[in-house]
Amino acid sequence: MKKLNDKLQLIQKEMAQNIPVDILNAFGQSLHELIEQNLEDRALKVGDIAPDFTLPDAEGLPVSLYDTLQHNAVIISFFRGNWCPFCMAELTHYQEAINNNLVDSATVIAISPQSIHFNHDLKVQNNLEFRILSDKGNEIADKYGLVFTLQENIREIYKNMGADLELFNSDNTYKLPIPATYLIDKNKKIVFSSVSTNYMERADVCDIKL
């Protein structure tokens, strides 16, 4: 199974080759500004009790964290949306891990602020077997300390590249979650966390000690 970091580096290389320099520079400046805000400091950490939630999955069915924890530990991945190639690489990485029986002792759940039908399309088009939940308004991501507001100059760039956040998320707040991965044990405690303002960095399944 290919390392997730290898996939992420390949995406960066492709972006450098195909995206105009001025846009790459804008992305770089945006990321630098967000990193300087130390957004990760607000996020829940190892040892914290994970807040419960009930969110609709890609079929509109409610999924409760605490109910799920009665049966298994839970891996939660907060991601930005199916318009983000780094997010897509992460989600397909988790599906590969499931296919290779690497996460049998945990239930994988992915959460994004986008609407249910976009999560449904994502799941069907990529043959994802795990639950993908819609966190409208980033309500749950905010409880986990992960929410930030995208800078105004980046919003139009995203839209021109096909990432119309008002359309995907059905709101005009331009709020997104910092990509984050948590492992929560059956006692509701966070036992692994990976949170990074740099959306090009993600936790590999091999980093999670199940």
What residue ranges belong to the model's regions?
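N-terminal targeting signals for export/organelle localization
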Residues: M1-I49
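Short, contiguous, helix-prone interaction/anchoring segments in small proteins
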Residues: I35-Y66, V74
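Short secondary-structure boundary/capping segments
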Residues: R42, L65-D67, N100, N172-Y174
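Short active-site neighborhood of thiol/selenol oxidoreductases, capturing the structured segment around
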Residues: L65-Y94
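A short local loop/turn or secondary-structure capping micro-motif enriched for an aromatic residue
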Residues: H71-A73, Y199-R202
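Structural microenvironment flanking redox-active thiols in thiol-disulfide oxidoreductases
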Residues: L91-K143
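Histidine- and aromatic-rich ligand-binding microenvironments
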Residues: R131, D204-I208
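Thiol/selenol-based redox catalytic cores and closely related redox-interacting motifs
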Residues: D135-E201
